Amino acid sequence: MDKKKLNPLARFRGFIQAGATLLTNIHLPNFAKGTLYQGSGKYVCVPGLNCYSCPGAAGACPVGAFQAVVGSSKFRFSYYITGILILFGVLLGRFICGFLCPFGWFQELLHKIPSPKLSTKKLKPLRYLKYAVLLVMVVLLPLLAVNELGMGDPFFCKYLCPQGVLEGAIPLSLTNAGIRAALGKLFTWKACILLAVIVGNVVFYRPFCKWLCPLGAFYALLNKVSLFQMRVDTHKCVSCGACARACKMDVDITKTPNHAECIRCGMCMKACPTDAIQYKFGLGDKSNNEATKE
């Protein structure tokens, strides 16, 4: 395929991911100081999975912010947090996972480490675990499992999220003796999860995204209706199967162009010999294969 025809988003995705990670964690001097940014930016949720307690974090993690509201003794439905999540999802869907999520980029970098690689095609049922994590750990447990003051824990952040250890606990403990002294069994548990995720990513492609990420689960629910879509021109498609073989998210884009697991990474576009797959943004303009099905 002529590289000149490849969409710039797909061609420069790695640079976009790096830039998004830098902008999300722009307060770099705080890593050396061992302090957190506490400015007005922390009232704004970033689109990807990025820990609030990261020294460099410029904004709040949407998952953590949602749990904080749900687990509050003065719980009121948060139109802001829910609304901004829906806005992100309706505008971009899982494009956020593929381009704007710092932890997603971290997983892809790990997968580049030379090693035997294993397919996840036979493990597709595991993808439904992330919906259980979203429902149980992000919504139900913080809402229902409360203490005597009526406060609930942020269960996902506290017990499962590896990003919190990677971006928060480890950097802060390196510069703060008090934090190092306070590390206990919970940190050990979370560190083991992080280690498992790191090892898993070396051999599998983005397993946390596929199987456990509640933010990915939320965006997946809106992937088919998001304004940012994948389009397949069936007049150009020769049914060679190159796109399905290239997809590391185990999606056959010719059958389901906007599958819940599609992170819009563009690997299928790079593999297509006839330039039949493109990005589209906006209402209408359905792909030929979608129109044919109707």
Stretches with model-predicted labels:
Residues 1-254, 260-294:
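Non-ligating segments of multi-cofactor redox enzymes
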